[in-house]
Amino acid sequence: MNMKKIFKRTSLLLATALIGVTATVQAQKSPQDMDRFIDALMRRMTVEEKIGQLNLPVTGEITTGQAKSSDVAKKIEQGLVGGLFNLKGVAKIRDVQKLAVENSRLGIPLLFGMDVIHGYETIFPIPLGLSCTWDMAAIGQSARIAATEASADGISWTFSPMVDISRDPRWGRVSEGSGEDPFLGGAIARAMVLGYQGKDPDDQLKRNDEIMACVKHFALYGAGEAGRDYNTVDMSRNRMFNEYMYPYEAAVRAGVGSAMASFNEVDGVPATANHWLMTDVLRKQWGFNGFVVTDFTGISEMVEHGIGNLQTVSTRALNAGVDMDMVSEGFVGTLKKSLTEGKITMKTLDAACRRILEAKYKLGLFDDPYKYCDLSRPARDIFTREHRAAARRIAAESFVLLKNEPFEGQGKKSSRPVLPLEKQGTVAVIGPLGNTRSNMPGTWSVAARLDDYPSLYEGLKEMTASRVNITYAKGSNLISDAAYEERATLFGRSLNRDNRTDKKLLDEALKVASGADVIVAALGESSEMSGESSSLSLIHISEPTRQAEISY
């Protein structure tokens, strides 16, 4: 028997032994059983495999056929990947999970994460809109439905809730959080964690429609100076804990399974390398027992902070209390060298590896690596009639009516408030967001069916049938600058630029509006005009748009 066959046989025996352990341990579910299982597993792991559990590369739309020849696939087979994110489709995820379970030496299953922020394929209002409901049951239901759909498509981990308090409207990610109030933010954080993971904090993640939540971005991400994304945060501890920290703590108290480090500095130290934040506050003060993941390239971006090279920043992050490296691959590329040089200890490495393995254990992946890979579930559990009805109801609950008075002007006077509209006459939809499908779901709706959402114009026509004459005019392009507009058409969103002159667009809108009894103005931002790494210096409708002319 040659050495290759001996290795294969040994690997098979090891995998069989592990499967035998998992089949019994998942039935008992005690902390002691989990500790014994992970102790036994870690004794079998090499240093490289332990470091591999801390590695979270991005996949894109990889398939098994493509993956087998890819660098990511090779690393999976070598045990150098702990999880993947941005892989959509349960069949694809099942195939990649099979690669990890059957082709790696120890068969350790992968985590599969995605930004499931305000729905999966059934989309709910953006988080800022959800906060306007002040209805924790509704917000929890939105997370419960999102977890049901995401888990049906193979996802076991969501990078949500985003609970950053924001008080500067120029910041590009205001829409992802609940606004400026820490009490409301804390209540929403709890509701969403329980919605994703299960209602009972002591009995979560048991079902295959419950997924692990990730509170983010720890900490103070929404407090960057001048509303600039990734910027420095410098404030007193009194203000920090009274105005910004409570929502993170509320998520921890609800049992959140993971936390994401933020990009910004706190007290001059990047959060991703901030021991006081990640260890002293998060773990020691609040008792967090999950794992910490960086944001996208959060480790490698610290090189730009001037801390040092990739090895130095990777060492700083691990020693601070970060457990998983998203995309940078600083951990998998440098930690073994740092261990040899004494810059990290085996105790620190083992602690980080253990926390990742504990998350997989709590999710039940050692008992059934394909727990989230039931190929029959998507047709049954995604974009259902019941889910869409809930989304519609919660969206209506989120609306904020600022003013509803009788109309008076242009020689006309009404004795009743404008709303509700009567189903008669002519209604003109005016504005660049009036007839766009892809921008209806809002920002961070990465799994949305962009072509399945009717535009405002289409929806009104369908709802009123032939009883109301619904007309439309664009009035202006969403953004005057074509180059800027191209930047704002991310993630499959389309703005459908109209190349007519500004005057012709405005004249058309005036003509359409003059023939209407009611005008519905659809103005504002596209889904991606601001967001991660983007902020606005002007927060009103003006340049770089021509929309102000329509509103006047």
Give a label for each model feature.
Residues 1-29:
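Bacterial Sec-dependent N-terminal signal peptides
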Residues 23-542, 546:
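Glycoside hydrolase catalytic-domain context in secreted enzymes
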